[in-house]
C-alpha cells in the first residue's frame, strides 16, 4: 500500500496554476501506479466555515483539485479516501491553530475513516460530529483572529515576499511513526 497526498498546498498559493499542478499530480500518480503497489489517494476538505471571495475561490479550487484526484484514482484503480465522507471535519474545532491543517483529533478521526475505507478495524464513531459549539464572545473571537493574523498570515506574507516556502527549514512533527 502506497499512500500519496500532494498538491493541496499549491492550491492555496496566490500564483496557483491549476493546469500545471493538476498535470504534475496526474504524472506522479502514473509513476506511482507503475510500481505495482496499491495506491491510496486523498481528497481535500473543500469547505471550512469561510465566507467571502477568498473562501469561495478556495472552494472552487479545491473542488477542481478533488475532481482531478478522483479521476486519477479511477484511472489507476486506487483506493480513495474522500474528505467529503467526513463533513464534520469542516468544524473549526478539528483544525490546527493555523486554520489550514487538521489538529491531532482531526487527524485521528480521518485516520479512522481511512481504516474504514481499507476495511480494517477502526473506531466506528469516527464520523460523529461534535455537539454545536457555543458562540464565542465578540472580543474573544476578534482576539483569536488577531493572534492568527500575527502568528500565521503575516509570517506567510513575509515568506512569500522573500520567495521562501512555508516548508523551508521545517522538520517533521514526529521523528518516529506515531501509533494511535
What kind of feature is each model-predicted range?
Residues 11-13, 48-56, 90:
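Short, solvent-exposed loop/turn segments at secondary-structure junctions
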Residues 20-34, 64-71:
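Alpha-helical scaffolding segments of alpha/beta enzyme cores, especially the outer helices
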Residues 75, 98-99, 105-180:
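Conserved catalytic region of serine esterases and O-acyltransferases that act on ester linkages
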Residues 2-5, 40-42, 80:
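Ligand-binding pocket scaffold of soluble enzyme catalytic domains
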Residues 16-24, 56-64, 98-106:
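Alpha-helix N-cap and loop-to-helix initiation/capping positions
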Residues 1-24, 46-47, 153:
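Oxyanion-hole/transition-state-stabilizing segment in secreted/luminal serine hydrolases
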Residues 33-38, 78:
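A short helix->loop->beta-strand "cap" motif at the edges of active sites that frequently abuts
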Residues 49-83, 104:
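Substrate-gating cap/lid alpha-helix
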Amino acid at each position: 500500500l502506497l499512500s500519496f497526498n500532494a498538491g493541496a498546498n499549491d492550491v492555496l498559493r496566490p500564483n496557483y496554476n491549476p493546469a500545471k499542478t493538476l498535470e504534475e499530480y496526474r504524472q506522479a500518480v502514473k509513476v506511482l501506479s507503475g510500481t505495482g503497489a496499491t495506491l491510496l489517494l486523498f481528497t481535500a476538505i473543500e469547505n471550512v466555515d469561510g465566507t467571502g471571495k477568498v473562501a469561495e475561490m478556495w472552494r472552487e479550487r479545491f473542488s477542481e483539485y478533488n475532481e482531478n484526484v478522483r479521476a486519477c484514482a479511477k484511472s489507476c484503480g486506487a483506493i480513495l479516501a474522500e474528505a467529503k465522507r467526513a463533513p464534520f471535519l469542516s468544524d473549526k474545532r478539528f483544525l490546527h491553530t493555523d486554520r489550514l491543517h487538521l489538529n491531532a483529533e482531526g487527524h485521528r478521526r480521518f485516520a479512522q475513516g481511512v481504516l474504514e475505507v481499507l476495511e480494517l478495524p477502526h473506531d466506528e464513531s469516527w464520523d460523529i460530529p461534535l455537539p454545536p459549539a457555543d458562540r464565542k464572545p465578540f472580543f474573544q473571537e476578534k482576539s483569536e483572529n488577531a493572534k492568527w493574523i500575527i502568528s500565521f498570515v503575516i509570517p506567510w506574507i513575509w515568506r512569500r515576499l522573500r520567495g521562501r516556502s512555508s516548508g523551508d527549514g521545517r522538520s517533521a512533527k514526529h521523528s518516529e511513526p506515531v501509533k494511535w
